[in-house]
Amino acid sequence: MRAGLLYRALASLGDVRVIVVPVHAVCYEASGLCPADRLTVVDLNGAADVRADLVARVADPLERARVAALHPRPSLSEAATIEVAQSVAGLVGGAPLVLVMREYLAPYLDAVLDRHARPMCILDVDDVESTARRRSGEPAEAERYESLERHYLRRFDHILACSPTDASDLRGRYGIDAMVAPNAVNIPAPRRVSPRWDVLFVANLSYAPNVAAAHWLCHEILPLMPDATVALVGLNPSAEVYSLRAENVFVSGTVPDVEPYYATSRVVAVPLQAGGGTSIKVLEAFAHRRPVVSTTTGVRGLPITAGKHILIADEPQSFADACVRLLDDCSAGKRLSEAGYSLVQEQFAIERVTASLSGALSRLTSNRGE
């Protein structure tokens, strides 16, 4: 979704080429983002982690640990060899503007960042990864991302953050003034259909914090609502998510469109306990006029008032109680969903955010040319 927002904003300024660096085990389908002839996937086959190989050759264990600590690299940046970075630079060519999505892709732009006469380079920090990884209980990976952030953030001409909260985090830790480019969602036409599911959780179901959230929902919360049904819907469910299937738990697998599931569910749950950025899940539920129960983590960075737009609960019993309240009291759910819908219309509708971001990018490029 955020990729689509950024693509739309860039496309309003001129021709856009999309370069996909497939760092995940699964290369998600990107052809729907742009015309096929404007999309290139970088070949990472054989791109060994040279840094890790060199560190492994240091014989003394203490010296090896010291070298590894001096040159940490997040796992998703391990394929950023000199050859791969040069390949990316060749694909960039003479483009006047390069926008990189996600911190871990910054090392793949090394050969471009090192140019004397280089394009304007913008890094989109959808998550402050060091913060997100620390919340996820990954201290070693968090330290690697902190090293990456210290080394790379200032090498970019501009930084985008998805919320004022993340912008403040970057300013406080690195002295960087990031421009806020909020997440945005499409607002669908309302549909009248009979409910099928009591509680819906929509997410990328291969992402570790979402897998943990699904597990918490099904094993800790659902037993406290024995008559309720749950639908887990989203991209590429892990084996652990599939193992949650039961008589009252449905796992969809990857679907082309989540709209039918919103239309046939009564309450949306956002049971996140870790992760960063802002939750598109919450905004998407608001756009579909569905009442939402979320943890505090799930609404981080969003201008939301508990009790007005959403119900917030951080313990299994209180989360279950909030869901049951909305299932039993349709008028309470309607009040929340209408307030959430109004908020999305005013601040997070895709057309509004795209226009604002397009204007900001246009001003940045114009100022550079002066």
Language-model segments: residues:
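N-terminal subdomain of nucleotide-sugar transferases
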Residues: 1-43, 93
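Conserved catalytic-core segment of nucleotide-activated headgroup transferases in glycan assembly
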Residues: 2, 8-9, 172, 180-264
